Amino acid sequence: MKKVLLYGDSNTWGHNPVDFTQLPRTWGNVAQELLPECEITIDGECGRATLWGEGPKHGIACFRERYFVKKHDFDLIAIMLGTNDLLKQLQYKPERTAQALRQYIHETRVVYGDKTPEFLIISPIHVNDNVLKHPVFSELYSPKSVEDSKRLAEAISKMAADEDVYFMNAADFAKASDIDGVHMVTEEHESSA
């Protein structure tokens, strides 16, 4: 049985844009249904950025703690991060996000050596203009966040090609809801799987 890790943020966790609860069906759950021959571990946390974040469950430090201290036998690690890098408090440029994702790949290769899993790096969906009207997220994201979200795929795909890893652009399959401009509704999770 193939083992897959999905490592991401609130769109991997399944943040419901309507009421902030967890959606019962996420792209990870749908992937598990579509790939019963795979054992899929879903590790999504709200607010997770590539390098830093609030709390112990965020950034690359969390990845190291969970997947380097005790080695796992994953065949594939899929990482979808970058949306929280666009927060006003961080404002990473797309190129910095791509470099941070490169760090995940490099460090995993050092730790796992010849048992390094394959990587699938997923550029997240675009943040849309509705985020600027949302009562909560308008305080966290800016017009620059919306624009930079559209540039993530180019920077991340270039890095993925340089590192010879798989790449997918989630924005080709799904979009953020018009409710909050950041998170997917169930139908978009189903489309992105």
Question: Where are these predicted regions, by residue range?
Answer:
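Conserved SGNH/GDSL esterase-like catalytic core that processes O-acyl groups on lipids
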Residues: 2-5, 11-103, 113, 147-151, ...
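Histidine-centered active-site loop/cap adjacent to the catalytic His
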Residues: 31-35, 166, 177-193
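Conserved beta-strand segments of alpha/beta enzyme cores
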Residues: 39-41, 118, 164-166
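Residue-level recognition of beta-strand->loop/alpha-helix junctions
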Residues: 42-44, 123, 169-171
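Short acidic/His/Gly/Ser-rich catalytic and metal-binding motifs that mark active-site loops
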Residues: 86-88, 128-133, 175-177
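A short helix->loop->beta-strand "cap" motif at the edges of active sites that frequently abuts
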Residues: 109-118
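Substrate-gating cap/lid alpha-helix
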Residues: 128-169
